[in-house]
Every structure is written in C-alpha cells, then in structure tokens.
C-alpha cells in the first residue's frame, strides 16, 4: 500500500487538516521536477539556482507544517492531561464516598445485584459505571493522539526521503534530523505515560487488579475501515436476501392471481404496508451506514455509539432480510388462507407480534445491546420534554416523520380488528362487508388525524425543550415553527375529507386552506433541509457552487442530484392532491399513498447522508473525535455554550481561508486503525514502514 493511501486510511477524520499534507508535498516535488530547466538547453548554474529556490520554498512549507503539528499536538496533549486529572478526581471522589458510606475500600467487596442496593448505592453504582465508560473514551482519545504522532513523523520521514531521491541530495535527511527529530510532537513521550497510567488506574481501581478485563474494556477493534462481519453473518445476509427476493417474486404472481378473484384486498394492503416500509427503512439504513464508513463520516461518534460494539451495515441487512422473510411468508399465508385451517386474521397478528418480540426480547440474544439502545432512545423521544435532546434523539424523531404511514397503518389495524373484522369468518382476504362504509380509514372519528400528527409533535416539543435549555430563538423556535405547519396541513386535510364525504358547501374552502398550508410546509421544510440540515448554498462555497466550502463525498453530482430529488419529493403531494381532487374512483388515495410512502422513506435515506455529513464537519471544526463523558454534570453556562457551538449555522464554514495551498477536498476519509490486536502491554499504534520507494 502506498503511504498516501495508508495515511488517508488511518487518519482521524475530525483532525484531517492537522495532519501533514503529504499529497500536497508530493505534488510540489513532482511539479518542481517537471518544470525544472533542462541541462541540455541551459547552463548548470541556472538549474542549481532553480532547485535552490525551490528547496527554500519547500523547507519553508515544511516548517509551517511542523509548527502546525507541534501546536495541535501540544494543545491536545494539554487537553488530555487536564482530562486525566479531572477523571482521577471524579474517581477518587466516588471511592471516598463509597468508603465513608460503607467502610470498605475495594469495589469487589461492594459487588452485589443492583436491585439489592439502596438509593445512594445505586447512584454510586451508576457513577462507577459512567467512570468506566469515561476512561474507555479517554483511552481511545490517547490512542488517536499517539496515532497522530506516529503518522506525522512517518509522513515527514517519507516525504523528505522522496525529496532527496528526486533532487539527488541529502539535505532532506539533514533537515529531518535538525528539525523533525527534535520537534516536541516527536520527542514528547508524555502520551505513552498517560496511556500507561490510564491502564493502571482502570486495572487497579475499576477492575480490581484484573488487567485482562481492564484491557478488554479499553481496547477497541480496528477502525481503519468497516469492521469485518463474522463469516456466519455474511452467510446469513446472502441467505436471507436471496430467500427474500424469491419470496417477493412468488408474492407478485400470487397477488396477480388473487386480485383477479378477490376485490377486498385494500384492508390487507393497509395492514402490511407498514411492515414493508419498516423493512425498506432498515435496508436503506444499512446502505447509509456503509456509505458513512466509506466516506469517513464518523456516525459512531455522532450517535454516541459504543465504538467497541455497534451494528455494521451487514447486521442491518441481516435484520432487514430476516424481517422481510417473515413479512413475505405472512402475506403469502394470507393469500392462501382459504385452503388453510388457520383463520386469515391470525397471520398479521403473528407477524407483528414476532417483530415486537424481536425488539423487546429481554434475553441477551439477537443484538441485545443495540436493541436496548434503540428502546432507550425511543423512550427519550416520546418523553422529550423531560430530557435534554441530543443528536440521536432528534434524528430518530425525524425518521419517524418519514415513517408516519407506519403509525397510521398501525392505528388502522387496531381499529379494523376492533370494529370491522368479522371474527367468525375465515375465508377470503380479511373479510369486510363491501356494502358497509369503511370506518377506520377515514378522518371522521378524529383519531387518525391525531396519529398522523404524532411524529411532528415529537419534533415540535424537542425544539421547545432545546429552546428552554439554550434560550436561543434561532434555530430552535424557528425549527418548531416548521413542524407546527404539519398540524395545520393535517387539520385542513381532515376537515376537507370529512366535509367532502358529507357534501358540505364549504368543502372548497378547506381544500384551498389545505393546499395553502401544504405549500407553506413544503417550502419551509425544503429551505430548512438544504440550508440548515445540509448546510448547502453557502456564500463561501468557492468552487463548490451552491454547496458548501467543504464537502466529504467524492462527487459534486451527488449533492446536485440530492437537491433535485429533495425538491421533487417535497412537492410530490401536488400529484396526490391533483388526482384525488379530480377523481372519484374508490381507493385512488390508497394507491397514491402506497406509491409515495416508500418514496418518502427513500427521501429520508438521501437526507441522512448529508445531514450526518454536516454534523461530521461540525465535529471536524471542533476537532472532536471521541465522546465527552463525565460523572460531574455540566453547569448551565457550559451547557448553553456547548449547545450554541453545536447549533452554529456556519459551524462548518470559513475553515479554509488560510490554506497555504490547495488539496483535494473530497478525499476519502476513514477512521484510524487502532492497535487492538497487539499484545497486552503494547498499546502503540504501529505505522506501516517500508523503504520501498514504489510504495511511497
């Protein structure tokens, strides 16, 4: 592997600009070599003066890079020392409180089931648990800084060696000895001391002297690329996806056959549509995860996941494939229920019962930690006014806004099973008397409109909570206003629908109000998508016209296509209104909703790429590479300042005005590969070292 590729694969993305610009140095050397005057057409003194002038410029640039690296390393080292002192104080305070309250000095003597502990003991137990997590994140930051130290030294050594080879001189090696090998970032060994001290503290104070357990907690898997999934996971992904494709083909033929003989298919579609959207969402989220990893967007940090244990894209594909198989089998069973002894209404209940059990299964199987994380996140979303709102909280609430059809179909299913289903019949497709008007699929009884507003309500109260915490009207109250437009849109849609059914004279008034608020809502959300969520249309975008100053994904066309796609799908309701308002055929609205619901999930899938990219660039601007975890809570002023930094509209702008030369802004970013596979006491990140010039 060439060192340039090795460097790009192992850097910490959030610190990318603080590394040696190896590619820019290579371009300088090759450009100087190509533009050098030939000895055949000019005298030797002219050639020497040319290279002397170039070397002066080259070494001046090296000095600037070295100063930049020294400064950043010193700042991060000082930050690490302060953080270590803080963690030690927090640990000592927790141990002192335990000692005073129980008269014991070791954690081993205090170990007993959590439900047997008093309130004070529960608090201390949580503090110790938080400290373990905080030390593991701090240890990760130390490894990243050590990796930064080693990569930069290797980069200087290789580029100066290349300099000497191209210019046929030894001045590069001399410059390295005089400047690089005595530079603070290389000579300072405090980082190694901090790593050793952290290992000792975790081993002796938090793991009762069990070094193997301590190192298992501290070390992380290689992060230079996506973590390879186990072979059996890869096998299951292929197996489940293959079966799912075959079953879908079977479903198509079965559906064509059944639609020719049975016209009561719409209750079935409404009940199974939500399950399909959930499977589509999980599959597209797997593609999101793969794309983020490939581009170097650190979604693990953004969502504050455990870097040692989180779902990869293959795991998400596996879950989507497994649920897809259950969905297909259940739907096929409904199609062939007339020849079965099991009543047709059992199959949807069995499908969604299995899905719910998969999520809430209390045993530590089937990705227990990830499911538990999701359940906690859902709880935080639905109790938003009572918690501080983090990125993962409002990200999930935004996903629910695109999955509102699932909630509406769930409400329909509950209503259908409660009021419309004939439990004493078992033939046909979810029997419903076609002579009786449908009750559950209409707005007339009010519940449907309320359910449709739930996702927007969750984001609305999250925005109000963030305003309460920060006291900043912009962007939080303005964002709340965006979600409030959904309430008006749904209200007038419901009023129009009910008045149209009853042939009221004021139906047209509610229709125009519905259209008006649809236009307001679509324009509002579109502008927010492009400007605030994606950070596009930046006036300082430079060569990235209509985009932003800094982009992560390699092709600008991705951004332009995403903008067009977002505009089209944000205004797709115009087609729905046009058709439903001019057509009186039954189930036209159902057909359009069934077509547009998967498209909305796809729109959110595209939105996810650029929303997390924008958040990642904010982390890069703050050089934030690990989670900030502390037992001691932030005071109100610190919390407000942190929220302001996170919500800064131009948080990713104006970061490249002082560039000394240009380099490719779209370079593929990947997280650093850490030394998790080294021996127990060897925590140093090994940098690939080769003297083969073909690999440099």
Curated annotation (Swiss-Prot):
Side Extracellular, residues: 260-264, 338-343, 423-429, 504-506, 586-587
EXS domain ranges (all copies): 439-643
Span list, region Disordered: 672-696
Name a biological process GO annotation.
Answer: phosphate ion transmembrane transport
Q: Which residues carry this modification: Phosphothreonine?
A: 690
The record's similarity note reads: Belongs to the SYG1 (TC 2.A.94) family.
Q: What is this protein called?
A: Solute carrier family 53 member 1
Q: Which organism is it from?
A: Mus terricolor (Earth-colored mouse)
């Amino acid at each position: 592997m060439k060192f340039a590729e090795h460097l790009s694969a192992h850097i910490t993305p959030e610190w990318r600009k603080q590394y040696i610009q190896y590619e820019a140095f290579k371009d300088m050397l090759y450009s100087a070599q190509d533009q050098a005057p030939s000895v055949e057409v000019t005298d030797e003194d002219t050639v020497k003066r040319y290279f002397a002038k170039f070397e002066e410029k080259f070494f001046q640039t090296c000095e600037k890079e070295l100063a930049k690296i020294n400064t950043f390393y010193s700042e991060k080292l000082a930050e690490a020392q302060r953080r270590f002192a803080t963690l030690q104080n927090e640990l000592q305070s927790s141990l002192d409180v335990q000692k005073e309250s129980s008269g014991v000095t070791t954690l081993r003597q205090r170990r007993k089931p959590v439900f047997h502990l008093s309130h004070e003991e529960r608090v201390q137990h949580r503090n110790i648990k938080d400290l373990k997590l905080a030390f593991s994140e701090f240890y990760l930051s130390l490894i990243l800084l050590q990796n930064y130290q080693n990569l930069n030294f290797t980069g200087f050594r290789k580029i100066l060696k290349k300099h000497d080879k191209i210019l046929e001189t030894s001045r590069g090696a001399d410059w390295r000895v005089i400047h690089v090998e005595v530079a603070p970032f290389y000579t300072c060994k405090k980082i190694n001391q901090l790593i050793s001290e952290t290992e000792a503290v975790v081993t002796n104070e938090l793991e009762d002297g069990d070094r193997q357990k301590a190192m298992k907690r501290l070390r992380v898997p290689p992060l230079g690329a996506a973590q390879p999934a186990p072979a059996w996971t890869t096998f299951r992904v292929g197996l489940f996806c293959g079966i799912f494709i075959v079953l879908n083909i079977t479903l198509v033929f079965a559906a064509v056959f059944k639609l020719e003989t049975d016209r009561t298919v719409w209750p079935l579609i409404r009940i199974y549509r939500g399950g399909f959207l959930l499977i589509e969402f999980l599959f597209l989220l797997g593609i999101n995860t793969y794309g983020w990893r490939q581009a170097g967007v650190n979604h693990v940090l953004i969502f504050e996941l455990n870097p040692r244990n989180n779902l990869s894209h293959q795991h998400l594909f596996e879950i989507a494939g497994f649920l897809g198989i259950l969905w297909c089998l259940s739907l096929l069973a409904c199609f062939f229920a007339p020849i079965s002894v099991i009543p047709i209404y059992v199959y949807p209940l069995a499908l969604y019962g299995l899905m719910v059990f998969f999520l809430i299964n209390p045993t530590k199987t089937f990705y227990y930690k990830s499911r538990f994380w999701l359940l906690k996140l859902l709880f935080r979303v639905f109790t938003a006014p009572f918690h501080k709102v983090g990125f993962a909280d409002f990200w999930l609430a935004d996903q629910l806004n695109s999955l509102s059809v699932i909630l509406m179909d769930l409400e329909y299913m509950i209503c259908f099973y409660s009021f419309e289903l004939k439990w004493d019949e078992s033939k046909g497709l979810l029997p419903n008397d076609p002579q009786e008007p449908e009750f559950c699929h209409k707005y007339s009884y009010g519940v449907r409109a309320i359910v449709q507003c739930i996702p927007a309500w969750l984001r609305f109260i999250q925005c109000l909570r963030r305003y309460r915490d920060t006291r900043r009207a912009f962007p939080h109250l303005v964002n709340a206003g965006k979600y409030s437009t959904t309430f008006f849109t749904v209200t007038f849609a419901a009023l129009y629908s009910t008045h149209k059914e009853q042939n009221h004279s004021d139906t047209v008034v509610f229709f125009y109000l519905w259209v008006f608020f649809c236009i307001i809502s679509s324009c509002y959300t579109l502008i927010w998508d492009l400007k605030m969520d994606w950070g596009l249309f930046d006036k300082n975008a430079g060569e990235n016209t209509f985009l932003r100053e800094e982009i992560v994904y390699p092709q600008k066309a991705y951004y332009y296509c995403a903008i067009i796609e977002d505009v089209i799908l944000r205004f797709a309701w115009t087609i729905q209104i046009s058709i439903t308002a001019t057509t009186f055929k039954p189930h036209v609205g159902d057909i359009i909703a069934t077509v547009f619901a998967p498209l909305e999930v796809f729109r959110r899938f595209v939105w996810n790429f650029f929303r997390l990219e924008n958040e990642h660039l904010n982390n890069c601007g703050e050089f934030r590479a690990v989670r900030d975890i502390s037992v001691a809570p932030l005071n109100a002023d610190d919390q407000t300042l942190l929220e302001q930094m996170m919500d800064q509209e131009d948080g990713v702008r104006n970061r490249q005005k002082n560039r000394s030369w240009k380099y490719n802004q779209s370079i593929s970013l990947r997280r650093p590969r850490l030394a998790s596979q080294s021996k127990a006491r060897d925590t140093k990140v090994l940098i690939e070292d080769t003297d083969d010039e073909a690999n440099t």
